[in-house]
Amino acid sequence: VESFLYQSGPACRIYLLADGSNCPAEDFLSQAAYLHPDEFAKLTKLLDHSCDHGLPKNKQKVNTLGDGLFEFKTIGGLRLIWFWDANRIILCTHGFLKKRQTTPSGELATAAKWKKAYETAKSANKVRFIEDPP
């Protein structure tokens, strides 16, 4: 498992998880920038704020999903799922455009799979933190 640095600041560092050439969070962010530029700008501002000042205490922007998973969210429906690691590291699994009130179970399962893969790789000392974007 690789993790690519996406953003960094005094409050935390945000990494995107990847497995070889597969980096779902980066794919999501690239698509969001192209297909939903206004919402992507809001998400980018939220990530900037989180790195510089810490997570907002507003459930409209950051929400817990259970099992150690969280989401950055915009009003327009962009969701970026992540979890914490030591040393104020945020690891993003993937993102999606939410269209219903509840988070689809398939999205939660995908995030849980990435989290488990990361934890397994970390316990085997097989995680690479890469400071350059994917």
Language-model features, listed with the residues they occupy:
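Basic, Lys/Arg-enriched alpha-helical interface segments
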Residues: 1-77, 86-90, 96-134
